Amino acid sequence: MRIRTVTRDELPLLREIEWAAGECFREIGMPEIADDEPLPLPELARYLDEGTALAVVDAADRPVAYLIAEPVDGALHIEQVSVHPDHARRGLGRALIDHLGQLGGATALTLTTFAEVPWNAPYYARCGFRPLAAEEITPGLREIRRQEAAHGLDRWPRLCMRRGPRPPGAPGADDPA
């Protein structure tokens, strides 16, 4: 497994990975999420230019999982982590998250997620994230949640989560907030 920055010509592959990864939502009664359009190419390109776009690549150097993130209120906010189902359950999502934290410059990692989907909030809790109380939600995260609600994601319980930049158990892994 190798993690590297996504290239511009690979952006269409990220959309394919997200489509494939989203199919599992159909199986738990959330077909609207499975059918949701992945980010358009210009928006994905913005993460290359202004944020972070990482991929786990296979032996042929083709992305099989990806993570996009951007700075939000002093933390690196994970907008999306997707793993192609053919490569699921191999620790690729966790590896991308841990790699992001090691890039430096961020005091914490944040994300928003579905509270009751097994591979969402419960998974991220195992990766060291903790739910944020209402008073801990920063202005930038509030704006992200507002946009998610406008997109219809609030049909299911969602929450904001945060962890320190280092993996749980690593020296200095505690979340400073």
Region roles according to the model:
Residues 150-162:
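Alpha-helix-centered segments that form part of catalytic cores
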Residues 99, 107-113:
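A contiguous pocket-lining binding segment that forms or flanks enzyme active sites
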